[in-house]
């Protein structure tokens, strides 16, 4: 309303899409922008605040939304960075021009041309059942899987509208890689992973120990190549009877010249992945994770033909970082606090356990052990937690198939991704309706993991940031969540189009899903069509109504 403060455009678009137009936000936002432009309408219906474009075809800003500075933005080739580090030292309530390539909702590189530091605002953290987290303002939109009249649909929901047991979409397309990584960076990544898991670095000495001689030799050679300082190597038999290989040095002068020095004096409970590793390409991160898992990781065969790959640490931040980096490679894991006081990152789904060695793997003998476990297990049974909620019910209800095909669809598991990867063509052959086939194919192509929301919690007032992305939906990835930026309110003339609408002046009918009512026409005391004109495509013809004085 004109007498009230401006509202976030994201909120208006989300409410319109949720109540009246479940077909994407782009057309809604484009309409809102046009109604705020005095060069597009003789009498604008929206009072916009912010960048709504210009007569010279300067595009409008995206709908403003905000996440906290620690959110990791995905970049091409497996790189990522904190959104607060895009423009170091950006002032609160500032717009900063940038030239940055980020990944969109499909995992494709797109241009981001501006960083917004939106000041300090109240924030909320969305946490999934697996442990994935993102923190943002109440009006920050995330891509969610929503049941729209029985149809599972990808829609934007504001954080304030997200509740436990909702489903958010996590982007998990493996990164595109361009050639081998820099040799020196790779060796530093190997050392970092090895020393975080099984080493120590202090002001006066550094050391690393491992039972696998071949892996130990690889780490020692990497140390010589990167650090190049004098070090000692010795072996000793430990209590278990195994032979432990140890690298030790009391001269850390050369070590201080490498990026390994960043973990100096770090307590085990305070360990984390340094920022330079997040900025590294996928090939470097892979070597880091291989060393990390070879040290404190494990794999084991479990009852009922199941498997578990896990990483244990006493550092909550390191567990979060490991889970996030696994997601960057498309591997879904679960993070939790074990009764013993350790944080565990575990991979238990068969498909994810098979993906782990393909995308990452262990750095030494544990990789051979994992290969043996997988080879000894029967073929994947096709059922795990990786599924599309509501898809099976939707297909069975709307497939429009013969009774024999309907019976087949009711008997078989048709909402789990493992089944679609293996038998997708067979499932589609039993679905007659082409629209149902299209929806099912789109939701099961593997781009997204549909994670159940466990909680939405108050995280207090924090500095928040946003990016302007040059695409139709303005989407980019933050901690794997798909994030979707302006403020607006109605003008007095627009209120004349709505006056007395709640006094039975027009007829109302149910909306598309029957949850709310929508008017068949607006009262419109202000003759908008005559004053502002309109243009569009009718049935097979173009129509234009010019504005009149």
Curated annotation (Swiss-Prot):
Quaternary data: Heterotetramer, composed of two GyrA and two GyrB chains. In the heterotetramer, GyrA contains the active site tyrosine that forms a transient covalent intermediate with DNA, while GyrB binds cofactors and catalyzes ATP hydrolysis.
Pfam families registered for this protein in UniProt: DNA_topoisoIV, LAGLIDADG_3
GO cellular component, one term: cytoplasm
Modification after translation, per record: This protein undergoes a protein self splicing that involves a post-translational excision of the intervening region (intein) followed by peptide ligation.
CDD domains: Hint (cd00081)
Protein's UniProt name: DNA gyrase subunit A
Location of the active site: 65
NCBIfam families listed in its UniProt record: intein_Cterm, intein_Nterm
Taxonomic superkingdom: Bacteria
Other notes: Few gyrases are as efficient as E.coli at forming negative supercoils. Not all organisms have 2 type II topoisomerases; in organisms with a single type II topoisomerase this enzyme also has to decatenate newly replicated chromosomes.
Catalytic activity: ATP-dependent breakage, passage and rejoining of double-stranded DNA
PANTHER family in the cross-refs: DNA GYRASE SUBUNIT A, CHLOROPLASTIC_MITOCHONDRIAL, DNA GYRASE/TOPOISOMERASE SUBUNIT A
Stretches assigned to the DOD-type homing endonuclease domain: 191-331
UniProt-listed Enzyme Commission number(s): 5.6.2.2
Domain Topo IIA-type catalytic: 1-549
Enzyme class: isomerase
Protein location: Cytoplasm
Alphabetized InterPro entries for the sequence: Hint_dom_C, Hint_dom_N, Hint_dom_sf, Homing_endonucl, INTEIN, Intein_C, Intein_endonuc_central, Intein_N
Record lineage: Bacteria, Bacillati, Actinomycetota, Actinomycetes, Mycobacteriales
Family affiliation: Belongs to the type II topoisomerase GyrA/ParC subunit family.
Alphabetic keyword roster: ATP-binding, Autocatalytic cleavage, Cytoplasm, DNA-binding, Isomerase, Nucleotide-binding, Protein splicing, Topoisomerase
Role of this protein: A type II topoisomerase that negatively supercoils closed circular double-stranded (ds) DNA in an ATP-dependent manner to modulate DNA topology and maintain chromosomes in an underwound state. Negative supercoiling favors strand separation, and DNA replication, transcription, recombination and repair, all of which involve strand separation. Also able to catalyze the interconversion of other topological isomers of dsDNA rings, including catenanes and knotted rings. Type II topoisomerases break and join 2 DNA strands simultaneously in an ATP-dependent manner.
GO biological process: DNA topological change; intein-mediated protein splicing
Gene field: gyrA
Gene Ontology MF terms: ATP binding; DNA binding; DNA negative supercoiling activity; endonuclease activity
Signal peptide residues on this chain, from the entry's feature table: none
Gene3D superfamilies reported for this sequence: Hedgehog/Intein (Hint) domain, Homing endonucleases, Topoisomerase II, domain 5
